């Protein structure tokens, strides 16, 4: 089934070129199908890239999904064409009276800031509180996961001595969740973080389950079954060249950045990276849609 996105959204052209089944919102309205309603709070400066990555991993399921994109009103994005935001995004106030089947909150490049120093922190916590009643299931990514953990559970992020950067092996710790149904015991995931959450603090919260982690990269996937909240600290949705673009961007800015580990063939940044995480990414998002978003609705 298709992913329903605005007719002229740049992501649609990209996904159509990849033979990903998309459907424009105007065409979808002519069908008598109740699509799953998923709202995406996109906090990334690279909005087009991020919305494309998320649409791609949500598109390959038997379920029809309609995306609603929102951005913060308390902070005006500076790296995105204002016309793109006007045409394809809403603010929270414009959608707060609606009910959604799913919520996705992306990461954001504000990891090292204290929570209250983030311009949109108050707005974000309002959205998180709203989601308790207005959203069936939530998925939080990277900094979004850390922010939600702090808000709902009081667990603080910790700054790493150096950026954790590369493609790391992860291991399933708990198979009881349908989120990891069909996963291999060990799998690769792109990681790009300056901060982390400590496992011992998570284990102190009885309602949180650690589903997957890495001996090198730390926690990857947490699940709060009762509240239908999923916390994903890394980036299985990343494109083949995302870490490469981040590496070259930081080098051009003169920032301290090491070569992403386990990424370039022979650790040579002149070679094209090989994607070794795509199937895990697709399975995780498919499981989230099926078991956390759709099946509770159908009971």
Curated annotation (Swiss-Prot):
Pfam families: HTS. The keyword Amino-acid biosynthesis applies. Its EC number is 2.3.1.31. The active site is at 142 (acyl-thioester intermediate), 235 (proton acceptor), 237. Substrate binds at residues 163, 192, 249. Keywords: Acyltransferase, Amino-acid biosynthesis, Cytoplasm, Methionine biosynthesis, Transferase. It comes from Synechococcus sp. (strain ATCC 27144 / PCC 6301 / SAUG 1402/1). The gene is metAA. Belongs to the MetA family. The record marks 192 as: Important for substrate specificity. The keyword Acyltransferase applies. Transfers an acetyl group from acetyl-CoA to L-homoserine, forming acetyl-L-homoserine. It catalyses: L-homoserine + acetyl-CoA = O-acetyl-L-homoserine + CoA. It is found in: Cytoplasm. This is Homoserine O-acetyltransferase. NCBIfam families: metA. GO terms for molecular function: homoserine O-acetyltransferase activity; homoserine O-succinyltransferase activity.
